[in-house]
């Protein structure tokens, strides 16, 4: 039987989380999604270290092996603007190369839904680049509903699909 677990990331996880984020970045680039940067950009260990120290970053383990990561926040004014405290926001959902197709994405999002529910909030929210049709379809297959779009104000900025799903 396969064991899946989620725990809070620590400084000791930085190297493997950097690898996982870069694996996910490469997959996005392969689908012409440059929201995390173009080919060769990737994530540095310093960026991941800062993320781990400043946010709620989690490690997903499959049979004790780090296989995924994500961050969880209680607000996201950048993409969603000011909101009532009714949701939890997921960012950086990433699966390590070789671990795709094992249900880790849905496992992470179900875990987030349980956390949101435990905080007496109603929705799990996330965003993704609108032009990454495969990723948008994946989230929709998990029951997420696109409730809006957010265009970055920068010239040539991305347009983001804003998704939410009831946490119950």
Give a label for each model feature.
Residues 129-133, 141-142, 148-168:
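C-terminal "cap" of GNAT-fold acetyltransferases
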Residues 46-59, 89:
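A short helix-loop-beta-strand connector motif used in the catalytic cores of GNAT acetyltransferases and
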Residues 5-19:
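A short beta-loop-alpha structural element at the N-terminal edge
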């Amino acid at each position: 039987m396969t064991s899946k677990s989620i725990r809070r990331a620590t400084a000791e996880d930085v190297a493997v989380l950097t690898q996982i984020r870069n694996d996910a970045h490469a997959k996005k680039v392969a689908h012409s999604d440059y929201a995390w940067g173009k080919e060769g950009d990737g994530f540095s260990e310093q960026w991941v270290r800062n993320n781990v120290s400043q946010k709620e970053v989690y490690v997903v383990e499959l049979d004790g092996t780090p296989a995924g990561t994500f961050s969880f926040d209680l607000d996201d004014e950048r993409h969603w603007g000011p909101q009532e405290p009714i949701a939890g926001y997921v960012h950086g959902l990433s699966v390590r190369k070789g671990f795709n197709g094992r249900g880790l994405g849905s496992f992470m999002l179900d875990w987030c839904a349980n956390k949101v529910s435990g905080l007496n909030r109603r929705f799990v929210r996330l965003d993704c680049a609108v032009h990454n049709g495969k990723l948008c379809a994946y989230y929709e297959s998990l029951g997420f509903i696109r409730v809006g779009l957010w265009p970055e104000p920068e010239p040539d900025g991305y347009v983001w699909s804003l998704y939410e799903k009831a946490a119950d």
